[in-house]
Amino acid sequence: MSYYEPYSSRQRMLPNTPDNYDDASDHPQFASRSGSSSLQSSLSKRANSTRRSLKELSEGVQQRFQPITHGRSLQRITEDDSPSTPTAPPRPNRQLYRNSIDHLSMSEGALKQQTSEESPSEVSEGQRSNWSQSVVKIENALHRNYYTIAYSIVIIAYFAGFAEYLYFRLTSLIVPEHLVFHPPCEGKATRKIGKDGFHYGISICAFIGVATFQLMCFFGLTISEKWTQSKENPRESRRAAQREEFALFVRTMISSTMYRVFLCYGICSLINCAIIFYMVGIQDSLGDVVSTIFLYVFDAVVILYFIAFPLTTVIYHPYVHCFRRRGAPARFTLPDVGQRTQTSTLESNISGLEEAMGKATGGTPPVHRNPSPPVIPSLNFSRQDPLRQGHRSTGSISTDIPVLEEYLHSPRRQLPQPRLAVEENLDDERITTFV
């Protein structure tokens, strides 16, 4: 028993290894043995197994962390047969390798999952950019073809409703087929179920409201073409700049409300078609006087509805001129003043300036002493022109001077100096100047 107790205490100090568990099954045999040689051999065997397990553990850790650490940095115990004290190598800087260790400590499944999450995110961003570019291209195409799309929707809805009403109304007049419905109850089997005046009145009011909204949309579409484009130069006048600004405002409003207006107009067209089918297609009227009157009123409302669209186009569309006479002259025409030359234009400008100066001074406009001779177009830029002979004194200008030089020295080419008339009123201390 004296040998067993020290060994058990030593055994508790050794680590738990598979070899220890294997040898633990033979533990009772050591208790029954006697002799110091067997005990010493068992102790050396266990020590060697412990060293071997620690060495295998260090080699496994070294192989795992070899890409990021030094080969001998993690060897905590130096295996040596000498009885000297084991020494540990210097520790590496763990702060530098913390991120790398965390990355390597992750399992392969986590790494695959992370890469799979990153790659779809990149793909999704690329898909989003492509989708946004496609949406922008579609919106630009819709804005460029706004009027084509709008008129297509209006025309399709118009002809669909008109064809439906015409078909069901003619069918009800040519081949009348009155439908009679009775309740399933035995006590009310003789009672008829159908539309009376209340149903017809509600349907007519709903049709008028929806049709009014459609006509307003079509009216705005019709007159908007002349407001969305401004042919004037905004730099010429303030009015032209205001028109250009208003055109930009209308275009912006159209682009911001385009989809909603198209959707609302399409829904309204479906509602009108459903009302027409309910009123004319289903012939289940009770046959009372009020129902008959409301049915004819509905016919009148529908006819006015289908007439209003082409009438609005003819009256308000800027490019449709059905009521204009073909032989009518243009609104703005220049008066026929005959043939005019550059000399006569200068004379008229000078005379107008003299008249304005005469009115400003309060006197009578100057009277031309020498009236200008008649204008002869065939003698323009010729020496025989009467306008050229009027200011030349006999023998003052030689005939060898070129015509253009003589024309430039003509007094008609020189504007008179403006005369300033200053009126001073000493009593009122005011000075009035006319130019």
UniProtKB/Swiss-Prot annotation:
It comes from the Eukaryota. Residues 31-47 have a biased composition (Low complexity). Residues 1-95 are annotated as: Disordered. This is Uncharacterized protein C32D5.7. The lineage of its organism: Eukaryota, Metazoa, Ecdysozoa, Nematoda, Chromadorea.
